[in-house]
Regions:
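Short amphipathic alpha-helical interaction segments
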Residues: 237-253
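Alpha-helix C-caps/helix-loop-beta hinges
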Residues: 140, 253-254
Length: 256
């Protein structure tokens, strides 16, 4: 707070085993206002598919009751074998009924360097399931605030992707500045070494041209499902139509 203006709070990503009353108190006392918990699923069969150990969720719920934050988001994965809307509804309601006021539901992403011992859901089924999730959340009155995220009451958000600028701390964290994008090292020991030597843990820095910064802005603004021409002009000092008139025309012709 001595060096930067914090406009949208301080968020921390947590593993379920880290959600204890003691640790939450430490985070809150340090100024953290938002937390995101990587639940993935409350159901043991899907945790096994993901190689995750079973967690005592009641301990998590109890800790969240005792130590409250402005935003408590829980992350889930959909499009796993055998998953249906009914199984996902169970996860969604359990989250919102036990301390979460925001959820993120991401499709399973198969990274090439990870082991997977099950068959992926087809893109057609995945898309159908996403539409079912969106319809269900709309009927329940939950507010969709980005492609994969929903707020219980519409006033809680947790995402760096939809912020114009942000600072990231920790392994693999990213930082977005006015014309730079920085990625921290993924290696824990290298991260610790750099910090102990009073060096930045950055492993990659991208210097944006003005055009690249605009593209980045538009890509992640679209992620929030709404591109506002007034916001674009306020941020860049130029109109969206002037900078991307041709692209917008093509998009309209394609019905986008």
């Amino acid at each position: 707070k001595r060096h930067v203006v914090i406009a949208e709070g301080v968020g921390v990503e947590l593993h379920p085993t880290d959600v204890t009353e003691e640790k939450l108190i430490i985070l809150k006392d340090a100024g953290v206002t938002k937390i995101s918990i990587g639940i993935q699923s409350f159901q043991e069969e899907y945790l096994k598919l993901l190689g995750r150990e079973k967690t005592d969720h009641n301990k998590i719920f109890d800790a969240l009751k005792k130590v409250q934050f402005e935003t408590v988001s829980m992350d889930f994965i959909f499009a796993l074998p055998g998953q249906t809307l009914e199984t996902l509804k169970t996860d969604i309601e359990m989250a919102f009924n036990n301390g979460a006021n925001h959820i993120a539901i991401y499709p399973f992403i198969d990274f090439t360097f990870t082991d997977r011992n099950f068959i992926k859901m087809t893109n057609r089924k995945k898309k159908k399931l996403l539409y079912e999730i969106v319809d269900y959340c709309n009927k329940k009155g939950y507010v969709r605030d980005s492609l994969w995220t929903f707020s219980k009451h519409g006033n809680s958000r947790y995402s760096s992707m939809t912020r114009e600028n942000f600072l990231g701390f920790g392994c693999s964290a990213t930082t977005l500045l006015e014309n730079k994008f920085k990625i921290n090292t993924f290696d824990i020991y290298e991260y610790q070494k750099r910090i102990n030597e009073n060096e930045l843990p950055t492993s990659l820095t991208l210097n944006f041209s003005r055009r690249q910064r605009m593209v980045y802005y538009l890509f992640w603004t679209a992620y929030s499902l709404r591109v506002d021409s007034k916001d674009f002009k306020e941020f860049f000092g130029e109109s969206l139509e002037r900078c991307y008139g041709f692209e917008l025309l093509v998009a309209r012709l394609l019905g986008l």
